[in-house]
């Protein structure tokens, strides 16, 4: 737990203030990362990941795509930073604020956009209900088939790495 007199809390608070100031002044996320000493990449250290994510979320609050591109261009632990930014801005802009060309490319058979939308609607309805609401789940066999297929691809890559040239 971070307490106000804890030096770690003070460090995080200072970095978050810098993130807010940098976003207000128009610095890009890459420039902000450089400013806090992350010239080469954003590490997975929480005190760097969170301020960069907060900066991108504030600086690019009107453009989900620009925010995501900026944090990925920062380098390093981009999946974590992008997940945080995506969660913050995705909640703010909703499905209509996501880039259409990105959404159109989403495909994780057997879970598709219709499944995700239905699940979201069930979750919203469950907020008004004291009873758990059923949701349609992808068929277990379909998920198992898909996962075995990808496991075989991963294993093939692993075994290929055992063969020359190393």
Mark where each language-model region is:
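A broadly tuned preference for mixed-charge, low-complexity surface segments
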Residues: 1-8, 101-114, 134-146
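Accessory "access/gating" subregions that flank catalytic or transport cores
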Residues: 1-75
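Short, Lys/Arg-enriched charge-dense amphipathic segments
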Residues: 8-23, 29-40, 88-93, 103-109, ...
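Catalytic phosphate/nucleotide-handling subdomain of diverse soluble enzymes
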Residues: 48-134
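C-terminal domain-closing interface element
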Residues: 126-166
């Amino acid at each position: 737990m971070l307490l106000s007199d804890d030096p770690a809390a003070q460090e995080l608070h200072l970095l978050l203030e810098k993130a807010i100031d940098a976003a207000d002044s128009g610095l890009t996320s890459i420039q902000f990362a450089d400013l806090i000493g992350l010239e080469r990449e954003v590490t997975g250290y929480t005190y760097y990941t969170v301020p960069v994510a907060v900066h991108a979320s504030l600086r690019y609050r009107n453009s989900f795509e620009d925010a995501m591109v900026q944090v990925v261009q920062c380098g390093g632990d981009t999946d974590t930073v992008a997940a945080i930014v995506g969660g913050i801005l995705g909640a703010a802009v909703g499905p209509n604020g996501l880039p259409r060309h990105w959404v159109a490319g989403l495909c994780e058979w057997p879970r598709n956009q219709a499944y995700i939308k239905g699940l979201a609607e069930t979750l919203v309805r469950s907020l008004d209900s004291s009873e758990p609401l059923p949701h349609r789940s992808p068929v277990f066999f379909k998920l198992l088939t898909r996962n075995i297929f990808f496991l075989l691809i991963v294993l093939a890559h692993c075994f290929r790495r055992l063969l020359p040239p190393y």
